[in-house]
């Protein structure tokens, strides 16, 4: 079996953890990546952001061990989510929130280091659900998103370690 990882959630988890470690915690301590130039973001990564990338990789490797799966496929959200066209207020509560500095670097790293999947107009959990529905005995779905539990198959929650 292969492991499908909701890498959007995992990358955000490590990016926000980095921000909290760096300086005080809470959303007020987060430096908005959209407000920084790329050189400044690179400086952050070179100085002490490497532990977040190592932690991200370590988390994926731990999931592979705990689920006894053969390989990880990291799923990310594609561009242009169709839900915004249907419901303009979709995830409106998240608008205006600062974007963690390391998020893009973590995503770039994951796309270079791991097998990844994304599909335009779909979120990561949609990609996972489609893949798992097509081949239910082939995948374990790793996520903390409770909505994904609607998809029949084997599920793994990395926060609780429960399958």
Describe the predicted segments one by one.
Residues 143-148:
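Short, polar loop motifs at secondary-structure junctions
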Residues 2-142, 153-157, 161-162:
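Noncatalytic, basic helical substrate-engagement surface that gates or grips nucleic-acid strands
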